[in-house]
A protein has these predicted regions:
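Short, conserved active-site loop motifs that form the nucleotide-linked donor/cofactor pocket
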Residues: 71, 156, 181
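Short glycine-rich anion-binding loops that position phosphate/pyrophosphate groups of nucleotides
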Residues: 26-29, 77, 100, 138-141, ...
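Conserved beta-loop-alpha segment that forms the PLP phosphate-binding cup at the N-terminus of a helix
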Residues: 54, 68-93
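Conserved PLP-anchoring active-site segment centered on the Schiff-base-forming lysine
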Residues: 87-108, 113, 120, 126
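Active-site phosphate-binding strand-loop segment of PLP-dependent enzymes
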Residues: 117-168
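Conserved core segment of the aminotransferase class I/II
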Residues: 182-210
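N-terminal "arm"/small-domain region of PLP-dependent enzymes with the aminotransferase-like
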Residues: 1-50
Length: 210
């Protein structure tokens, strides 16, 4: 039972300083709801533990029509980004703004040199054939989507975060994969599975086996 004494719901009509909510996060500040969810989870065995992942692999690969041997599932897109960056050998990672805020954090943790750039700067980059580039396309921050495949041969690794592509797939590369391309997707946005932490990446068999 939840003790409701000294608990008040926030007044959402008032501006609260330093509470930033954007489209790249799935957060809320309703502590009553948080406690209720904890109570439900504590009293049920439903959706508490991860099951065997073979059915999930089959379901994802059948839905997106991609080969299972080139697919890896993970605990959301964040986990997969970290794993991909741990598995590739590059001189530098160019991160196209606006971007997911954890990419540079992982670069620091792993020891990868990185640089933030704008989309219109890519064509002028020189000698980047030993480097990688990271896009969020479509972009959940500014709502833009671009045809980026023309930049693919310029880089050693071409990493595309397509967590929003189920909403707009005109520029998705999931059906135009190449050996240097990595597609990262999440089920948290289109299916609302943020709490379950489910994502997958699609790339070369060598990378997936890493």
């Amino acid at each position: 039972m939840i003790n409701k004494k000294n608990i008040e719901r926030p007044d959402w009509t008032k501006l609260i300083k330093h509470k930033k909510i954007d489209l790249t996060k799935n957060v809320h500040h309703d502590h009553i709801l948080n406690e209720k969810i904890k109570e439900i989870i504590a009293n049920t065995g439903f959706l508490v533990n991860y099951a065997n992942d073979s059915d999930l692999y089959i379901a994802i690969c059948n839905y997106y029509k991609i080969p299972i041997e080139r697919t890896a599932i993970g605990f959301g897109a964040t986990d997969l980004i970290h794993r991909v960056l741990n598995s590739i050998d590059i001189d530098c990672l160019y991160i196209v703004n606006p971007t997911f805020m954890m990419v540079d954090v992982y670069c620091k943790m792993i020891g990868i040199k990185y640089k933030f750039i704008e989309l219109n700067e890519i064509e002028n980059l020189k000698e980047v054939n030993k480097s990688g580039i990271y896009f969020v396309n479509p972009n959940g921050v500014n709502g833009e989507a671009h045809d980026i495949k023309k930049y693919r041969e310029k880089f050693k690794w071409f990493i595309v975060d397509e967590v929003y592509s189920d909403f707009y797939d005109s520029y998705s590369l999931i059906n135009e994969i190449s050996d240097n391309t990595v597609i990262i997707k999440s089920l948290s946005k289109s299916l609302g599975f943020a709490g379950l932490r489910v994502g997958f990446c699609y790339g070369s068999t060598d990378l997936i086996n890493e």
